[in-house]
Amino acid sequence: MKKRSAPRDAFFNPRVLLGFVLGSVGVALALIGFGLYPGASVLAQKPGQPTTQQWQPKWEVIHSSHNDVSAPLREMATWDLPPVSEHEAPENPQIGIVRESGSRPDTVVQKTFAETLLADVIPGFNFDGIPYPGVICNCAPPDTNGEVGATQYVQIVNEGYQVFDKATGNSILGPASINSVWAGFGGVCQAGQGDPVMLYDQIANRWLISQFAGGLTHECIAISTTSDATGTWNRYDFTVGAGALFDYPKIGVWPDGYYMAMNVFNTSGTAYLGTQPFAFDRTKMLAGQPATMLTPGLVGSPANNEDPLMPADFDGSILPPSGAPNTFVEFPDSIGNNLNTYRSWHYSVGVPFGTNPTFTQVPSPAAAPFTFLFAGVPQRRREPAWATWPTA
């Protein structure tokens, strides 16, 4: 959800850090965990809880409420972003997790510069993205994300997007309002409410853009029809639920579907109810056909420990084994019953999509002990103390 405005100077954002950590771990677990899923239990259980309190999925198939194919974005009105003063936007609901804030030794601190690993990591090109303020919201966090495609780089900053030529850095389209992607679509998607996601489906060479809308009960997703982000898009509106607020959508690309996790709150945003995984029929969405969304329902207590889930996102050229599930990873607690563990699930949608689906807790790898920075306190900045860092 969009948040209050932020000054131009940099700030530390735990939410961005959380997304980066979980996304990286999710891909790693997806690659190492293929052999774990065949015999795993279909019940996600919190350690120490009795069998009678085990969580069980309540599967639901939800059809897209509307879909169409857009005109080429380069030919549509881009709904330019007028300059506005900094302003307040609604705060996100707070999960309310109590984190341990005391210091402890870092058992896996990096003491040497990884020159051998960075030798081949040389930026091919470096250029400025969307300029400040560049978007209407000026929100904190700005939910900045972007992806590299075959010939383009697309960046999102709450509430705008811009398409760049990745070879020259020249702007091809924008910056423009994300809502303009849904111009002429009708309904709530034309007035989205933030938390945008931009991904590049490397398997199909297509773009994915999303944001939520409709009082945090709708997820609007568009899939480009080619590798050109300025062309036409297959657009969808999914109603993810009712009687609750669905926040913090995070999406991953997988061969058999687009996977997503959201945090779920009561309608007033005062109580965290749990996390909920979803899967979208990727095959239908790539073809521009009416599509379905599949969910095992809310993963609340005792299965979820009030920590967000992150689906794995495929990047690379080596596909996972046929039928391999998508891995969802829960951020580890620094205290509590999920102590220093990346609790993990495998989500399988079946073939064809929606046939005998499973959402399964699997053996979870350990996490090194750590202290959660700025425990439970958003919008805080930490200044680096370079002089105190070890040099050998």
Where do the protein language model's features map onto the residues?
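Sec-dependent, cleavable N-terminal signal peptides
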Residues: 1-46
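C-terminal PAP-associated
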Residues: 39-392
